């Protein structure tokens, strides 16, 4: 969706208010040490695994402040093991099928590139249906901005986890991509929320 997003600019200026075009994303969730961690984990899970990650504003990047990194990873690892993959029409299902064979291949290729570049892959241990296009909910740790999974849109149930020390480092790293659709901020400090909202290059910021 990155390439088509350039086309509207060739059509001339749009009349009226500036438009927002939903043409792809690599949304960042930024998790500070003072955030309610359990609540944040649920938000992160919903943000990336809802609809198999087939959402332009899916929170496919997670920046965790270093002081809580180990705690967050443990909770995230435990939580994704409870996700159920299967028939999307079953009310007990959390993750449905990937939309096509081609998209499944793209997800696999990008995840493998992350592993090849040194990231560590964690996936659910649930059994996948034998028929159809399925990918287990996953997250990658040890990710740096040099990794493809940190900057390319995967459009699947895959989360790239990175760390930061300061708010300045967080928004600089979050902004270091060509997308600007959405972002999320997790903290219990209102002043920090407003600071991050003003610094993040994202059209929509949830906090």
What spans do the regions from the language model cover?
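Conserved C-terminal structural/oligomerization subdomain of aldehyde/semialdehyde dehydrogenase
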Residues: 30, 84, 127, 134-207
